[in-house]
């Protein structure tokens, strides 16, 4: 029966009498759910009738990791491996086909071109190494995620063993990441040494060329001095004879 003291209950009661609880435009779902009288019997508050995600957690993680691997593989093929192969071909053919052309250029231009090619090659090598270690780290992280789900929940010992293995795998992944950073630092250090050594070689070549020019000019000055002394001696001889 409708009650004048409960207008919200009267609204729901009228909707029930009309037989259009979920179809009447005047019905408010929020009012129905928040109503304490019908809250216990409401189908909207029952967890079993709510929309659930039918995909399990490991399946979602597996699908997400597969998408990540696919994206990284595409990025590696089109942005890393192909440019790296082209760089290696360029670096291999650089001294075979362009050595004679560079010999005719200035030493500074030759040094700049060789430095650019060397830096580009090392940068691509660093990217390859970092990407490889990132894939290894991703594999270990996936093992860390899936290791506890391998063991069943009711098997206590197997579950603890799986968690222990997962923890070890996590630390191994961190160690691999640190090793990748160490290798990157070593590669950059080697790159710096190569550039310094190349700079020293060009400096030695310039110094040797300057020394060669000095050596070639010194005998000419000696000859002129000798000629000058000969002239003076001849003049002295002529004056003495006279």
Swiss-Prot record:
Topology relative to the membrane: Multi-pass membrane protein
Gene Ontology cellular-component terms listed: cytoplasm; membrane
Basic and acidic residues composition bias: residue spans: 233-242
Region (Disordered): 204-242
UniProt KW keywords: Cytoplasm, Membrane, Transmembrane, Transmembrane helix
Chief site of localization: cytoplasm
Compartments it resides in: Cytoplasm; Membrane
Polar residues bias spans: 210-232
Membrane-spanning intervals of the chain: 75-95, 116-136, 176-196
Protein name: Uncharacterized membrane protein C18H10.18c
Species name: Schizosaccharomyces pombe (strain 972 / ATCC 24843)
Lineage of producing organism: Eukaryota, Fungi, Dikarya, Ascomycota, Taphrinomycotina
